Curated annotation (Swiss-Prot):
One GO molecular-function entry: xylan 1,4-beta-xylosidase activity
Cellular location(s): Secreted, Extracellular space, Extracellular matrix
List of glycosylated residues: N44, N104, N124, N239, N444, N618
Protein name in the entry: Probable beta-D-xylosidase 6
Enzyme Commission identifier(s): 3.2.1.-
Protein family membership: Belongs to the glycosyl hydrolase 3 family.
Keyword match Nucleotide-binding: no
InterPro entries noted in UniProt: BXL, Fn3-like, Glyco_hydro_3_C, Glyco_hydro_3_C_sf, Glyco_hydro_3_N, Glyco_hydro_3_N_sf, Glycoside_hydrolase_SF, Ig-like_fold
Any single Pfam family the record assigns to this protein: Glyco_hydro_3
Annotated signal sequence range: 1-18
Length: 792
């Protein structure tokens, strides 16, 4: 019997691989084709998702079930079910990193939005939603062309904990609130069937969008996946790799740094996929940690499927030695709640794990129910997708003018002006007769998008776009590549700099310095780039404009302090519209308003062990802490830094000076008993709060924002709080609200921050419980301060 099962399994797996790697069809394969297969109950759209999933699982034999446990799911020919590829990528546009997306068909490109770290610098929630929506439209269009799946493994919502991390560029930065809200907006935009205006014009005229109800029925346009769960932010550093690293995380840091983005992605974003990470967390591999994965389902209400990162189930045994055999690794993952393995490990070892009694077939069924439920919510079993709600989306909806305009706007809003001495910028294009552009990234298109970039709609370099403004523009790379190991090209760079009215030096990072599976060892500019900048600055007629590429922070203290370098602009990985956005900002057609979503540390920070996951500073061991919330050391640029060509001023119109928390607690609470016995109460523990009572204590902070300069501009208003130090580990400060507003010259506008004290004024204590410190909370708005007394 065992041998027979093994032979059947091999036949199914071989069939799946053969079908999956056929030439791509111009239309997607789909199940429930009439007349032979549409009569199955799982094809009956009048039944519930759960009923249909249960019906489908009940019809499968064990080898067929096992064939579904890989990202490349096997076909089930006798039921009319074709193979399905779960792994498609859409971090900031459709990408062909995985097998799900291909640009080898009739659709050969897709809109390349700026890398996530750049979009995050806009601090614009609406923009994040719009990007998610646009990528979803292109994803559905690609699916209709047979060139993509319906399940995409984005966004990356790990907190950018260490500036050396090679994948920090993929994240929305270092602040848990910003990361959380980016994740929610992107996922909503990506998954929601009913878009906020974005898709109305794209649905076919004969489809009544309203008849599909809203998203309360659980149906999805596409499936988004929040990754990497959890405490994953190291690729290769020292003797550690992401495959064997054990992230030792305190309960306090887990609660208020590492977990919030995932909790909100599930609770508020309703993500339909969660990806567990390679690393172990406190000694247990993330993909084998049942309490971690089940918390997402039981406490946070996760309804979707859980995938491992690619080969992360294999690492449980092969790299981490957590189990004694592959079968135990597979069993531990399935029991913990992993539904699908990116890779073939479960295909190869699940059957023997069942035969050895290490995992039951019932748990495999549980995994399949989760997988099929998501496919059913996507309409995969509802018949020919060409006749569905999105059936008319096609090549005209990819690289559309609307999407390219959106990509340009995202890049404009995300670019950050870090220095602008004596108002060097903007340049007057009518008064600039010649430009010199220096630097290996200035005329290189290959790394404009950063990691997880597909085939962009347009391929123009920074140099090409600047040439549109000043026809007499010369270029010299200075270095042969970003590593800049030699100064042999300096002479040409110096020569063109001497003869130009203005000089722009493009320096920084590319994917040779920071990427997946590669962390940085230094925070300085690579190789001899610093020397190149200084040599050019020494001969230029006017102070140099320094443009910085890359996702991670760079120590440019030398440039910050050098008067020969008049302006510094960070563009990150700006995507396909990066050159145009940069040129518009340099020449004043767009007023910059981005702010850094990360702290920029000095080179000395590399003395801190990247493997140390502690967020809080510890002076007794010389540990400076991490991110603006806890870091106590020197900074090159602080979180939220960002200049404009105009000046903004604030005025707090109204905010409470006192907040009583007494109504949050039941009469018999331990806190009230403490007070009755004359004990001092230093904080309120949220576990003791009456359910849903926090909403009654929300308050508004009304702010006037005035543009006192001569140029219209958009501006990110940031509201921080500093809580009383009544318990250990309170942040230095934390962001509790932000809003991007556009204010015309010499005008003002009002913005309102709605503050939920249970969320924005709370912190985790040393056992990971949320508490609100009592005492004076100081609210910061630029140079303004406002004291709020939180009492009981």
């Amino acid at each position: 019997m065992n041998l027979q099962l093994t032979l059947i399994s091999l036949l199914f797996f071989t069939s799946a691989i053969a079908e999956t790697f056929k030439n791509l069809d111009s239309h997607p394969q789909f199940p429930c084709k009439p007349p032979h297969f549409s009569s199955y109950p799982f094809c009956n759209v009048s039944l519930s998702i759960k009923q249909r999933a249960i019906s489908l699982v009940s019809l499968l034999m064990l080898p067929e079930k096992i064939g579904q446990l890989s990202n490349t799911a096997a076909s089930v020919p006798r039921l009319g079910i074709p193979p399905y590829e779960w792994w498609s990528e859409s971090l900031h546009g459709l990408a062909d990193n995985g097998p799900g997306v291909s640009f080898n068909g009739s659709i050969s490109a897709a809109t390349s939005f700026p890398q996530v770290i750049v979009s995050a610098a806009s601090f614009n929630r609406t923009l994040w939603y719009e990007i998610g929506s646009a990528v979803a439209v292109e994803g559905r269009a690609m699916y209709n062309g047979g060139q993509a799946g319906l399940t995409f493994w984005a966004p990356n919502i790990n907190v950018f904990r260490d500036p050396r991390w090679g994948r920090g560029q993929e994240t929305p930065g270092e602040d848990p609130k910003v990361v959380s809200e980016y994740g929610v907006e992107f996922v909503r935009g990506f998954q929601e069937k009913k878009k906020r205006k974005v898709l109305k014009r794209r649905f076919s005229d004969d489809v009544d969008d309203d008849r599909h109800d809203d998203d309360a029925d659980g149906k999805l346009m596409l499936s988004a996946c929040c990754k990497h769960f959890t405490a994953y932010d190291l690729e290769k550093w020292g003797n550690f790799t992401r495959y064997d690293f054990n992230a030792v995380v305190t309960e306090q840091d887990m609660e208020d740094t590492y977990q919030p983005p995932f909790e909100t992605c599930i609770r508020d974003g309703k993500a339909s996929c969660l990806m567990c990470s390679y690393n172990a967390v406190n000694g247990v591999p993330a993909c084998a940690q049942g309490d971690l994965l089940q918390k997402a389902r039981v406490e946070w209400g996760f309804e979707g499927y859980i995938t491992s990162d690619c080969d992360a189930v294999a690492t449980i045994f092969a790299y981490q030695g957590y189990t004694k055999s592959p079968e135990e690794a597979v069993a531990d993952a399935i029991k913990a709640g992993v539904d699908i393995n990116c890779g073939t490990y479960m295909l190869r070892h699940t059957q023997s794990a069942i035969e050895q009694g290490k995992v039951s077939e019932e748990l495999v069924d549980r995994a399949l129910l989760n997988l099929f439920a998501v496919q059913l919510r996507l309409g995969l079993f509802d018949g020919d997708p060409r006749r569905g709600q999105y059936g008319k989306l096609g090549s005209n909806d990819i690289c559309s003018s609307d999407h390219r305009k959106l990509a340009l706007e995202a890049t404009r809003q995300g670019i950050v002006l870090l220095k602008n001495d004596h108002k060097l910028l903007p340049l007057n294009k009518n008064h600039v007769s010649s430009l010199a552009i220096v630097g290996p990234m200035a005329n290189n298109i290959s790394n404009m998008g950063g990691t997880y970039t597909g085939k962009p709609c347009q391929r123009k370099t920074l140099f090409t776009e600047l040439l549109e403004y000043v026809k007499k523009t010369s270029y010299a790379s200075g270095c042969s590549d970003v590593s800049c190991d030699s100064d042999t090209g300096f002479g040409e760079a110096v020569a063109i700099a001497k003869g130009a009215d203005f000089v722009i030096v493009v320096a920084g990072l590319d994917l040779s310095q920071e990427t997946e599976d590669k962390d940085r060892v230094s925070l300085s500019l690579p190789g001899k780039q610093k020397d190149l900048v200084s040599h050019v600055a020494a001969v230029s007629k006017k102070p140099v404009i320094l443009v910085l590429t890359g996702g991670g922070p760079v120590d440019v203290t030398f440039a910050k302090n050098d008067p020969r370098i008049g302006s510094i602009i960070w563009i990150g990985y700006p995507g396909e519209t990066g050159g145009q956005a940069l040129a518009e900002i340099i020449f004043g057609d767009f007023n910059p308003g981005g702010r850094l979503p990360t702290t920029w540390y000095p080179e000395s920070f590399t003395d801190v062990a990247m493997s140390d996951m502690h967020m809080r500073a510890n002076s007794s061991r010389g540990y400076p802490g991490r991110t603006y919330r806890f870091y106590t050391g020197p900074q090159v640029y602080s979180f939220g830094t960002g200049l404009s060509y105009t000046k903004f001023e604030y005025k707090i119109l109204s905010a409470p000076i006192r907040l009583s928390l007494s109504e949050l607690l039941p009469q018999q609470s331990s806190h009230k008993k403490q007070l009755q016995h004359g004990e001092e109460l230093r904080y309120l523990q949220l576990d003791d709060v009456i359910v849903n009572s926090c909403e009654s204590l929300r308050f508004n902070v009304r702010v006037h924002v005035s543009n006192t300069g001569e140029i219209d501009g958009s501006h990110v208003v940031m509201l921080f709080s500093k809580m009383p130090p009544v318990l250990s580990g309170v942040p230095e400060k934390q962001l509790i609200g932000y809003d991007r507003v556009h204010v015309r010259s010499n005008e003002m506008m009002e913005t309102v921050f709605v503050i939920d004290p249970c969320k924005q004024l709370s912190v985790a204590n040393d056992v990971g419980k949320r508490v609100i410190p009592l005492g004076s909370h100081v609210l910061f708005l630029g140079d303004l301060q406002h004291s709020l007394s939180v009492e009981f």
